[in-house]
């Protein structure tokens, strides 16, 4: 019996993310199901996106918090250069695709923090937006 070809973890994670978005979020009726964000689900998608988009190079944030936010779907905060980022996601998100896109959005800010120590929507953020849209159909 021939052996299965080995697939790298990041390729498998990309496929997992694409398949999930296509199956559960695309044009299917399942996308209209009510979704409740939890920290466990946020951590799950953080790990999947880290493998798929960042090749597992993004260090873990110090925490991911789900709480009510005013005027934003998510935040990525770091108080000092030595701190890991804290990612906060709005508890009011009821759409799975928006939730995954928000986690990805805040992960790009986390990457910006570790790479350049800035959290903005300038050139590097726009490049990541193109990457996520092209590869996963997610608009950050």
Feature roles, as predicted:
Residues 1-101, 110-140:
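Active-site-proximal or metal-binding-adjacent scaffold patches in catalytic folds
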């Amino acid at each position: 019996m021939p052996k299965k070809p080995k697939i790298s973890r990041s390729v498998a994670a990309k496929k997992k993310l694409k398949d999930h978005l296509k199956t559960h979020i695309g044009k299917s009726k399942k996308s209209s199901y009510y979704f409740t964000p939890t920290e466990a689900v946020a951590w799950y998608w953080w790990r999947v996106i880290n493998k798929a988009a960042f090749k597992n190079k993004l260090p873990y944030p110090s925490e991911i918090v789900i709480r009510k936010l005013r005027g934003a779907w998510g935040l990525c905060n770091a108080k000092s250069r030595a701190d890991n980022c804290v990612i906060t996601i709005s508890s009011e998100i009821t759409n799975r695709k928006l939730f995954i896109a928000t986690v990805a959005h805040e992960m790009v800010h986390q990457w910006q923090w570790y790479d350049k120590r800035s959290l903005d929507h300038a050139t590097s953020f726009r490049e990541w937006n193109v990457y996520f849209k092209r590869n996963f159909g997610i608009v950050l």
